[in-house]
């Protein structure tokens, strides 16, 4: 292969800056153990690096003072599955769109097909936009959550999340 041109940046960030490779190489050579696994030096140091990173990310994302509320996951799919499966309970209603990634559609459809949740997909227009009024009309008394992608990497549409968020708060 001559020159690699990587266009699937949603899957991962590649190539990474050299400083990232250098840090990871150094980290795995010095601290490549499970954090908090026991009291030996490398495990304690690894736990300190994880907690320090968690604190920095909590600050970056304006997460308040409790850095333990920030959860690390394998990737975006894992994160979305953790959130969706953690919120699902028998008898709830969920609102979403068919514009969502499979990491949203698959667990929602599975829970719907199993009879655990009632699921409403709101339509989108010919340009790929979801209209906030359609979200509002789909919400029921037992609606527990609404899942709408902010920006489609397929269509490039940016959904009006501020308006949708206000509707959800009502």
Question: What residue ranges belong to the model's regions?
Answer:
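Pyridoxal 5′-phosphate
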Residues: 1-170
């Amino acid at each position: 292969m001559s020159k690699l041109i990587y266009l699937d940046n949603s899957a991962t960030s590649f190539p990474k800056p050299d400083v990232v490779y250098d840090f990871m190489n150094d980290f795995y050579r010095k601290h490549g153990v499970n954090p908090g696994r026991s009291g030996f030096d490398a495990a304690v140091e690894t736990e300190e690096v994880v907690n320090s990173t968690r604190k920095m990310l909590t600050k970056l994302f304006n997460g308040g003072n409790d850095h333990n509320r920030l959860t690390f996951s394998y990737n975006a799919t894992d994160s979305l599955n953790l959130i969706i499966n953690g919120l699902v309970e028998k008898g709830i209603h969920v609102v979403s769109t068919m514009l969502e990634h499979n990491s949203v559609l698959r667990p929602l459809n599975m829970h719907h097909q199993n009879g655990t949740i009632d699921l409403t997909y709101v339509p989108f227009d010919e340009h790929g936009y979801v209209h906030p009024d359609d979200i509002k009309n789909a919400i029921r008394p037992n609606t527990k959550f609404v899942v709408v992608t902010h920006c489609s990497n397929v269509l490039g549409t940016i959904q009006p999340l501020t308006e949708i968020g206000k509707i959800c708060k009502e």
